Curated annotation (Swiss-Prot):
Transit peptide (first-last residue): 1-35
Location of Phosphoserine modifications: 101
Source organism, top-level taxon: Eukaryota
Assembly: Complex I is composed of 45 different subunits. This is a component of the flavoprotein-sulfur (FP) fragment of the enzyme.
Basic and acidic residues bias: start-end ranges: 38-50
BP GO annotations: aerobic respiration; proton motive force-driven mitochondrial ATP synthesis
Protein name in UniProt: NADH dehydrogenase [ubiquinone] flavoprotein 3, mitochondrial
Cellular component aspect of the GO annotation: mitochondrial inner membrane; mitochondrion; respiratory chain complex I
Membrane spanning stretches: none
Protease in keyword set: no
Its membrane topology: Peripheral membrane protein
Amino acid sequence: MAVSLLLRGGRIRALKAVLLEARVFPGELVSVVRLSTESEKSAKEKELHPKTQSVLKEPEPTDTTTYKNLQHHDYNTYTFLDLNLDLSKFRLPQPSSGRESPRH
């Protein structure tokens, strides 16, 4: 049904028809009403407990300009080659199909 309405050029009508069929509007209205009542309750609670707001701690300032874990990144020119040499003894031989590999 929505496709036929879109083909007629009435995109707004088609969207409205799809949303009405899916019953989106009534659900959204209920959620808006729920949110408004919750915000009223929280405002009343804030008036009753003004001390809890002043007790909240401020977040600690963080220094993101330096990396703290320096031993984790200890690279030099031969790091990859050293690791490659150390791990080469644990590598398994590659399976062979019996044919020679193509030369490019």
